[in-house]
Amino acid sequence: ILFDESQVEQGRNFSNKIWNAYRLVRGWSIDESIAQPEHSAIAVKWFDSLLSQSIEIIDDHFEKFRLSDALMHIYKLFWDDFCAWYLEIIKPGAGMIDRKTYEETLIFFDKLLKLIHPFMPFITEELWHNIEERKEGESLMMQQQPKANVYSEEFIKMFEEAKSAIVTIRSIRQSKNISPKGPLALF
């Protein structure tokens, strides 16, 4: 196996991403008076479906001993889908989040840590113990891998279309020097 320093750097960057996502989520305060916003409910439904679909794909990669493919799928799921989309959608403006979205997010984080653990055991073990209080001797290493729930491929597809539209709009705004903060009329 050839040593490539850029792979070490990529691993470091991924570790930082995982740690910072954890810090972001744990930095939120729950406001019991806030009902779950519609955009958060949609994001939860999408990510739950996507996570279940991904678990099936990752399980298939493991069964066929395609460890590199499994890792790449987990990497993209965490970095692109969980951090860049899900967390950005649900991120509360004032640091206060509704309980339902917060609890679902911790469940997702727990499942993601279990998926990442075979490849990055130390950081995932540390964060898993910090997510909630664990019993003496309890270890992420001894936990079952998450199982896929029933999910809607149609919902995933619809959400992907919405993401594509958003990316296109952002690209047009940037190419035309239109402020990303200003309102934009779409037809």
Please describe what each predicted stretch is.
Residues 1-13, 63-64, 68-69, 152-160:
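Conserved phosphate-binding loops in nucleotide/dinucleotide-binding enzymes
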Residues 62-63, 94, 173:
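Hydrophobic residues in alpha-helical segments
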Residues 52, 66, 74, 169-173:
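Long hydrophobic segments that form regular secondary structure
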Residues 13-26, 44-54, 71-92:
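Core structural elements
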Residues 1-26, 72, 103-125, 129:
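Structured ligand/cofactor/substrate-binding pocket environments in proteins
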Residues 31-59, 87-167, 182, 187:
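Acidic, turn-prone loop/beta-hairpin segments
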Residues 69-73, 180-185:
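Short amphipathic alpha-helical interface segments
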Residues 1-40, 132-136, 174-181:
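Catalytic adenosine-cofactor/nucleotide-binding cores of aminoacyl-tRNA synthetases and other
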